[in-house]
């Protein structure tokens, strides 16, 4: 099933959850034109059907993989530290408001972004276990 959108999305904010992603899309004027919850499997397929746009996410381990994938689809995916997104939140905290704050923050010219890491960079060596299985 392919998702077709009848409006032009310029910026997307994604709040990454364990099982679902909250998506808020803004048009060029900054008006909200998309507010949906997608499952993990729907994110890549639905975003593949959109023309390239600016996509913001809070930096976490899962965001690096998604950022690499979205960049390969032609989108401009950017990661931000959560502490820099927080000032853009309005009202009571919920996942859609977090996604909206991410969409607002990613557009700011003074925003500090986190570089997307490769899978090798994220694969940190583990300390040796003190438990012996002999």
Task: Give each language-model segment a name.
Residues 1-133:
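Phosphate- and other anionic-substrate recognition elements at nucleic-acid/protein interfaces
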């Amino acid at each position: 099933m392919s998702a077709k959108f009848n409006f032009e999305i310029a910026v997307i904010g994604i709040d990454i959850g364990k099982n679902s992603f909250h998506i808020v899309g803004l048009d060029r004027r900054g008006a909200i034109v998309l507010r949906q919850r997608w499952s993990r499997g729907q994110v890549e397929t639905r975003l593949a059907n959109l023309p390239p746009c600016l996509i913001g996410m809070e930096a976490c381990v899962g965001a690096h993989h998604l950022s690499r994938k979205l960049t390969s689809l032609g989108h401009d995916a950017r990661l931000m530290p959560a502490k820099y997104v927080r000032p853009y939140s309005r009202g009571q905290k919920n996942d859609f408001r977090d996604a909206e704050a991410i969409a607002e923050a990613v557009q700011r010219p003074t925003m500090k972004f986190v570089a997307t890491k490769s899978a090798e960079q994220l694969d940190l060596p583990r300390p040796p276990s003190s438990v012996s299985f002999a």
